[in-house]
Swiss-Prot record:
Ranges: WD repeats: 110-148, 150-195, 208-247, 282-322, 325-364, 371-411, 418-452
GO CC list: nucleolus; nucleoplasm; preribosome, large subunit precursor
Any Gene Ontology biological process: maturation of 5.8S rRNA from tricistronic rRNA transcript (SSU-rRNA, 5.8S rRNA, LSU-rRNA)
SUPFAM superfamilies linked to this entry: WD40 repeat-like (SSF50978)
The name this protein goes by in its record: Ribosome biogenesis protein YTM1
Organism expressing this protein natively: Laccaria bicolor (strain S238N-H82 / ATCC MYA-4686)
Subcellular locations according to the entry: Nucleus, Nucleolus; Nucleus, Nucleoplasm
Sorted UniProt keywords: Nucleus, Repeat, Ribosome biogenesis, rRNA processing, WD repeat
Chief location bin: nucleus
Amino acid sequence: MASTSTSANGGSTNASIVSQPVVFTTQTQYPLPYQKYMIPTTWRRYQLSQLVNKALSLVKPVPFDFLIKGEIIRGSLAEWCSEHGVGEEETLEIEYIESVMPPQKMSEIPHEDWVSSVSCQLPRYFLTASYDGNLRAFDLSKNLTASIPAHPAPITSLCLVSSSLLDDNSQQIVIASASHDLTARLTQVALNPMASTNESKAMASLHLHTAPVSSISANAAGTHVLTASWDGLIGYWDATVPSTDEVPEPALNERDRSKKRRRVEEGEVKAKRKAPLSVFKSHTARVSKVLFASGAGETAYSCGFDSTVRRWDTETGVCSHTITASEKPFLDMALTPDGNSALATSTDRSMTLYDLRSSTTILTSASNTYMHPSTPSCVATSATNSHQVVTGAYDGVVRIWDLRSPKSAMATFKPWSGSGQKVLSVDWKRGIVGVGGERGLEMWKVGEEQKV
């Protein structure tokens, strides 16, 4: 319809321009008073963002993105209305959100072998696990502060169990790792920013699984860990170190006994062999991911190649709820900060959002599906924005998503100079996304700049 329309500079024009009645809503710290605007249908994100900034009289401009019915506007209002069959008389409710600033590469740290897992959870450090069996810690200046030969086979997963500050200003941390060697391990590391080398100690090896261990995670208190394996089992463990072995060593031949005697004579400290507190049995194929829900750790979630997402009571070891998808072998999973939803990536090139509060056990509990051009191998959620997640894929692309807009990613970037090398792991903390893969480790600044 022809009407007086708002201009991008805050004035108005009487020219005969097709306009659409619009009201704006937001959940940000920049709300507008409720008011109906007549917006030219030729406008796109940039003009809408200018309007909101001028209406709010913001001293420092804040870029916004805009959503209609949960979908981010990528073109003009006219294009959106035409695609969705919306008439000129219909009032549009448009939600605005703060834009994701273009990701900026911070640094790159090559590794000799694939980086299968990366953690940004420890302030001022990045932790990596590699197919060469080593755990590594790097500071913000890219200095290698610790290198630990934790496993004799590729490491698949790591997590930070606990961290404490010592009197000499160093940090004592415990890292849990999982490996193709059928074990998981707890390793203690002292990180001193003033020391050229840092000490590590093998605390315990976790013995249960009969196939590669694919995932390990710790609860928030650092008192318990979970392991998941290709054997379909999930192990539930406490993080204490026993005084003696809880699992006997396998029988050794004469050659192995000689090697063991040499290690003892050289003073090598042997990790204690731990047994699980309980074993969770319900998956019918490989378990690819297991993690604790937020809180005290009474609840855990897992996903696997049997196309299921399962909820567990850690005290009883009972599977209390199962979401079954159709032919979706799951590779990775993350929980939203509120704990109400799970995001699971699959070999069918999708990431699916599941409502964990739903009582249904079938695919109808899926809220949205986010398609990728290549298999998304990993996913991590933002700690500060409940709507934003990051995925890494086998096409070598990292994608930043807003969960309210499933059609396309908010931003993308290609690590390792766009070489197309597979991304195997991502983590997101304090505005930094760590990316691990075939070419090593890269760190990218994503979102609001925060103190690292």
